[in-house]
């Protein structure tokens, strides 16, 4: 058996903390009974992070790899994986059971990055959502030796949730005239506490959000002199067809059914004058921008879905 230890310097999610570890295994096939364990890698939290790697040279090395891996997992409280709740962890449990050895994954919480990143899909232009697809977003900026290091790097994408929280720092804002059109553009710019792992661009017919490094820019197309303010609890609103905006059902109870319809995420908004949030109302400006960010982030919310021990 070949054993290696590395110091790791890669971006990673802030959720990865003390007593956590990241695990990845390589096997000959998918079925545990007929598939030999070829390698196992585990990255542990520290300053810097450490990676332990065990590679089989012969068939009998499988048990030794499992034994070495168990010593590290026993010291961990939560196991981070990429698609590990579907493959790596069930495979390991079966292997330990087959050798009649204590299962080091028992009683550990787990976080599967593949599942945790699902709400972020709208932010990426990917044909599929395998580890290699997520790694392509980094454009080869980092040297990755194996899938364990790849999963660690991909975990940093969870930090993109910070794009949708306006920091306490000041926010630059202004109104731009759009050449050749009657519509106007409302633009806001601010700095995030930490640099984002990748550049991001999100847009629809009204909003356009871009991020590069630690700077975020939000552009909003105005309907004349008004802005759309969205509400996330759209199930409590009706969209008024003639008026072109949504109102709470406590206010629409007596509106005829043919003049309203149930609001959905994309039309659950009210219209507010630009002058009410700009230029000399910083408190209202921040409140308005935050409402837009809450609308744009969709299903991205913390805490992450950390699964309880099995």
Which ranges hold each PLM region?
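DEDD superfamily 3′-5′ metal-dependent exonuclease/proofreading module
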Residues: 1-310
């Amino acid at each position: 058996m070949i054993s290696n230890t590395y110091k790791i310097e890669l971006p990673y999610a802030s959720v990865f903390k003390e007593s956590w570890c990241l695990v990845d295994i390589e096997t000959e096939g998918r079925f545990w009974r007929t598939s030999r364990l070829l390698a196992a890698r585990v990255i542990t939290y520290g300053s810097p992070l450490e990676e332990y790697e065990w590679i089989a040279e012969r068939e009998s090395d499988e048990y030794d790899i499992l034994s070495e891996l168990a010593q590290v997992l026993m010291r961990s409280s939560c196991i981070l994986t990429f698609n590990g709740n579907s493959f790596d962890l069930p495979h390991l449990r079966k292997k330990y059971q087959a050798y009649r050895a204590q299962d080091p994954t028992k009683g550990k919480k787990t976080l599967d990055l593949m599942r945790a990143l699902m709400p972020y899909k709208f932010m990426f232009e990917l044909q599929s959502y395998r580890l290699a697809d997520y790694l392509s977003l980094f454009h080869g900026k980092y040297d990755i030796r194996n899938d364990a290091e790849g999963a660690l790097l991909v975990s940093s994408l969870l930090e993109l949730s910070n794009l949708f929280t306006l920091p306490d720092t000041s926010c630059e804002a202004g109104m731009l005239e759009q050449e050749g059109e009657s519509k106007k553009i409302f633009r806001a710019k601010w700095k995030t506490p930490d640099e984002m792992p990748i550049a991001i661009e999100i847009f629809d017919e009204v909003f356009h959000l871009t991020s590069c490094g630690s700077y975020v820019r939000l552009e909003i197309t105005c309907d004349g002199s008004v802005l759309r303010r969205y509400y996330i609890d759209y199930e409590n609103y009706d969209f008024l067809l003639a008026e072109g905006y949504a109102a709470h059902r406590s206010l629409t109870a007596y509106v005829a059914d043919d003049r309203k319809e149930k609001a959905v995420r994309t039309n659950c908004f009210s219209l507010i004058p630009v002058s009410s949030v700009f230029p000399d109302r910083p408190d209202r400006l921040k409140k308005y921008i935050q409402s837009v960010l809450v609308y744009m982030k969709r299903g991205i919310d913390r805490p992450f879905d950390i699964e309880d021990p099995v």
